[in-house]
Amino acid sequence: MSYHDARRRHPHPIQTFRPESEYSSSAPGSGAQTPTGSGASSSQLPGLVSSIWGGLIRRFSAETPSLTHSQSYPADSSHSHFDDHNYNNSNDNNGVDGVYVPPRFHETIQRTASPMQPPPLEPVQLKGFAPDTPASARILTQAIAEEIRIMVPTRLSIVDEWNLVYSLDQDGASLGTLYDKCAKYSGRRVGFVLVVKDAEGGIFGAYLSDFPHPAPKYFGTGECFLWRASVMASLPPPPSADTTNLRGRTSTISSVGTGTDTATNTATNHNSGDDLASCTVLRATTTATPPHNDSADDLFADLTGTVDQTTIRFKAFPYSGVNDYYILCESHFLSVGAGDGKFGLWLDDGLEKGVSSTSQTFGNEQLSDQGEKFSVLGVEVWVIGSGGL
């Protein structure tokens, strides 16, 4: 029987030994006598000792485990250190059985850049021209396409095959025909490049995130942008200039000349504060003189002939964020960019007349050197990412 069970069975405290003097007679007049001799005290002594001893045993037996447990770890500092060491390096510290500790948490991790580099992009391939289409009627060239490629979304910039959807020379001067040929790409994640040539040979256009089609309101996304490629006269470097280690971007854009037997290869980057994206490129080569051709298209063609040094400035005008007037098409016109009653690029339904003004959508300059209004000599629409559809 435990101590607490005994307390419940005997709620009254255990009688203790009292001195002999406390034992007295009963009330006066009574005949009963209370024992007062040494015989009574000696008979109660074993029970008293047993009670005291049992109480001490019960007390120490209840307190000793907690005291021993509380004093065991401080008394042995090496045990505590060993326990902590095992905890920090235990394999059970996986976040479930303990606090997660990475295997190399306290180690210095040395990382080096990967020597692997993404492969270079394959050159753009322009497909879709008819075999009998003359070079003078082919507006977009590979050199200009490479410049446009830099600005298109990444998912399309890795595509190296551009397919001709519409050509004014091959399909006739009709905006309706242009809409019909582009309609088959509805719902596909592709991009379109609109290319225009004016009467002075200037080449410009737009990148369209959606296929051009008649719609009651503006459509498209901020991926759209306007662009232009203009020819600029440039002086050759002086004889004392060292162009051996000249660095910069290079492209293969050149112009036809009357003949020369010297050549210089140079390339420069030009960024104007007013233009969000612009590039100036230059190349000259030396071979036999080809027949002279005044076609403006040959200013951008890659020729195996003698050329003069000519600078081609390519400018792109990305979305400005001012408004969302990306593309607006109706049966009688096609427009890209707008604001304040002006269009960034506008073409009529006969693809004969065009308008280009500064627009809030792209913050562009006039795209044609003819002025705000220009005459159209050629129009092309190219699709990127169609997979040969």
Swiss-Prot record:
Protein name: Oxidation resistance protein 1
Region (Disordered): 1-45, 67-90, 238-269
Composition-biased stretches (Low complexity): 257-269
Major location category of this protein: mitochondrion
GO biological process terms, semicolon-separated: response to oxidative stress
One Pfam family cited in the UniProt record for this chain: TLD
Family designation: Belongs to the OXR1 family.
Naturally occurring in which organism (per UniProt): Neurospora crassa (strain ATCC 24698 / 74-OR23-1A / CBS 708.71 / DSM 1257 / FGSC 987)
Subcellular location, record wording: Mitochondrion
Its biological purpose: May be involved in protection from oxidative damage.
SMART domains: TLDc (SM00584)
Record field: compositional bias (Basic residues): 1-12
InterPro entries: TLDc_dom (IPR006571)
Coiled-coil region: none
GO cellular component: mitochondrion; nucleus
Entry keyword set: Mitochondrion
Ranges of residues in domain TLDc: 138-385
Compositional bias of kind Polar residues: 22-45, 241-256
